[in-house]
Curated annotation (Swiss-Prot):
Belongs to the XseB family. InterPro entries: Exonuc_VII_S (IPR003761), Exonuc_VII_ssu_sf (IPR037004). Its EC number is 3.1.11.6. It is an enzyme of class 3 (hydrolase). SUPFAM superfamilies: XseB-like. This is Exodeoxyribonuclease 7 small subunit. One of its GO terms (biological process) is DNA catabolic process.
């Protein structure tokens, strides 16, 4: 089974949230949707963690560059 891509998982998660927000699901459907949402959320977080590690490894290969954490808006943290 091929790995699910981040973009695919995020699109599924967004669609699932929209469906749940309508309030038209039964309790059982809502529980199944919630479980799937948790799975997709964890998958997306894992893919983002993997991408962050890859970027840090690439930066570490260049000894003149230091790794700086990013703020939530994506800008460098200059502290």
């Amino acid at each position: 089974m091929a790995k699910e891509k981040f973009e695919e998982a995020m699109a599924k998660l967004e669609a699932l949230v929209r469906k749940m927000e309508t309030g038209d699901m039964t309790l059982e459907e809502s529980l199944k949707a919630f479980e799937e949402g948790i799975r997709l959320s964890r998958l997306c977080a894992s893919r983002l963690d993997d991408a962050e590690r890859r970027v840090e490894m690439l930066i570490a290969e260049n000894s003149n560059v230091t790794v700086q954490p990013l703020r939530e808006n994506g800008e460098k943290n200059e502290s």
